[in-house]
A protein has these predicted regions:
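Hydrophobic alpha-helical transmembrane segments of multi-pass membrane transport/permease proteins
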Residues: 22-48, 62-73, 179, 232-239
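Aromatic- and glycine-rich beta-strand/loop motifs that create alpha-glucan
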Residues: 1-32, 254-257, 261-262
Length: 263
């Protein structure tokens, strides 16, 4: 059975990776263009007037946050759109009735989201080299934070797809939750610039820990303890994974299949 599960996992991975690579002009190019505009506008044009932050130029300061923002957005979008499309077309029913454990299904879709997030992250990092010199303080923390964040938001995208009933529902969470939390997560500023009340409030934003941890990997500076960063990521991953497992485990007629039959 282990061989069967491995074949199923590789098949889902291959399907998910081929899906976004087949339309790479739509999935990989737009985020790179968007981040390039951020580099030009906020880094070159505005950053030259802001000055240094923690001993680094403003461009050097925001690059890790912009890379992480691209990874978050694309890992989330890949799984949310792919799983909901399969659900909408009722292709997911074939997977749910197959002798494939729920863990394998989740790992397959999450693997696709992580792959897209990492691809975009690498491309954005390559573009950033035209603006700032490449500098890494801790390869371990760069890789760890990047991987855990991509896994977390792939799981979040899966949750969104499970609950969504229409394609409009897919855009609600990114628009009203993900985007505000990302922009308020310390991408463009250090938490030390905020008044004490807003600093304390910012610590309730989980994206703050991801961006601070990733920035530490590149620059060696952070606004939050590193142990807290890893702990927050691990706790959220476990919670989201268990919730995804519970919702998908409700077979053979989960809530979304009953919804389709009731229409």
């Amino acid at each position: 059975m282990t061989h069967l599960y491995w074949v199923a996992l590789k098949s889902i991975w291959a399907k998910e990776i081929n899906r976004f690579m087949r339309i790479w002009v739509q999935t990989l190019v737009p985020p790179v263009i968007t981040m390039t505009l951020y580099f030009i506008i906020f880094g070159n044009l505005i950053g030259s007037r802001i000055g240094e932050m923690h001993g680094f130029t403003y461009m050097q300061f925001i690059v890790p946050g912009l890379i992480m923002m691209a990874v978050i957005t694309n890992a989330y979008a890949n799984v949310a759109s792919s799983f909901f499309s399969a659900k909408f077309q009722r292709n997911i029913e074939e997977l749910l009735v197959a002798p494939v454990p729920t863990h394998v299904i989740i790992a397959g879709y999450v693997g696709g989201g992580v792959a897209r997030g990492l691809c975009v992250g690498i491309l954005v990092t390559a573009i950033s080299l035209f603006f700032v010199p490449f500098q890494v303080h801790s390869w371990l923390f760069v890789a760890l934070t990047l991987l855990l964040t991509a896994i977390l938001f792939s799981l979040a995208g899966l949750l969104n797809a499970v609950f969504a009933k229409t394609f409009d529902d897919i855009s609600l969470i990114p628009t009203f939750v993900l985007t505000p939390l990302t922009y308020l997560g310390g991408v463009f500023y250090s938490l030390t610039l905020l008044p004490p009340f807003w600093q304390a409030l910012s610590h309730l934003n989980p994206i703050v820990y991801m961006i601070s941890g990733f920035r530490f990997g590149f620059r060696g500076i952070t606004d939050v303890p590193l142990f807290t960063t890893v702990a927050v990521l691990v706790v959220f991953i476990i919670a989201f994974y268990l919730l995804c497992w519970y919702l998908i485990q409700r077979r053979p007629r989960p809530r979304w299949i009953r919804y389709q039959h009731s229409r």
